[in-house]
Amino acid sequence: MATKIEQMLIEYGKNAENRKLQTYYSRKSYMEKLGIARAEEPHSAYWANLLKGDDVNCDKKESPLMWFLQVLVNRETTATAYGTTSPIPADMKISIISRTLDFQIEEIKAEKKIKEIANKYFSTNPNWSNVSEPCEDELDIYIKCAIRGVLGIEKLEIIVENKVTQKENGPKAKKNQLRPGYDDKCQTVRYYNACNSTSSSNKVQLFVLLTPDTTGIETTATDKHFIQISYQDLLDTILLPLIESDSLLDRQRFEIKDYVDVLNLPTLDIKESQRIIMAKTTEQADAIHNYVDRNRLLLCEALKAKIRKEKGMNSLTDDDLLLKFIDSNKNVLWALACSSYANLVDHIVDGKTGNIYLINDELKVYGDATFGQRFLEFFYEQNKHLLKDNLPFCDQLNDMLKQFFGTSTSWYGVKNKDPKHYNVIDKDNDLSAMFGNFGTGQNLAKLIKGLNTNSPDWFRFEKL
């Protein structure tokens, strides 16, 4: 008679949706076969070519560039340097939203030398007169268009900084800081200062940061003139509608579908830090969600078997079967680990790459930058009964955290002198203020170290 685990594995293998998902995530996109699936330059080249629209048989209203402009309008508020104003003039914005903007593409190029755009900026600065070496900085995607029909606007220039697995570059190395006030600045600050020097009253300049990250309220670029957009925005707004349209030949549709796979698949043949899913179709998001719902018990048993082996604990009868299950389904498990959908499971993240964890026998997936925030929510729920109404809320929770981690470090980034952060009636806002200091950098490293050494009964932290 089959054991419980054997029966679960039999049922797993019989399920057509499980087999379908396993087959999908065992595939390799053409970019992965070439070893460039997470390299920035090929993605920049792909989008530069697509935005030209040469392979798309449609009018300007349905062109990829028009829909790209729609994404910028939708995300313009992330460029917080403009305050309550907009980087896109009102008349132009109306034309973009109505898809009536009359533009003529003059140039779209990947890896455009910045000196070709801002030569005067580099050649006329008296502080750099003794610098003989040209600036070799490159703009990932450069777009220049002539504009007609918008009062006072004749040119549109878009500078796109594309980041796939890396963050924005900081100042150049000391030995390469030839131009004080430029080379010693972060990447987006350099690009904005140089390109903005060519601005004029009849030209609109838009600066864009493209990343796989979920777009928040404010751009993550150091220079806040950059509108932040995501690959998910481009997938939803440009690629998927194109596939369903009549604007493509079969060959072109196949090429775009293959690029969608590039975004969808976690690329297992490269180092772990680059195993990210850049964007996900609704179909795949739903498939992963349903996969976890169907197989939650089996996945938890498999993960516990893996932990027992790593810790040298006594194996159970079916552990070998469960370990073989993990090995044969590693592609699907990596897809789970790289997912960032809150409705899938609770996400707690290690900040570097996707991993699957067990917390109190519940399956958890680590894959985005909300580790600290979600831990703090959990910590608060477990300890809120200890809070006293006659004492500052943030101070109390902060003291509990310091005791938990055995450190004197303050864990929240609120202003101590601001009375509103000590209003015990305003606990939701206070808790929100504390969340902001938990997600990245040294705090995250301390948080993970603390969890590995000080886990209480209510929080068992296990890594697969």
Where are the regions that the model predicts?
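Charged, terminal alpha-helix-loop-beta segments
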Residues: 1-464
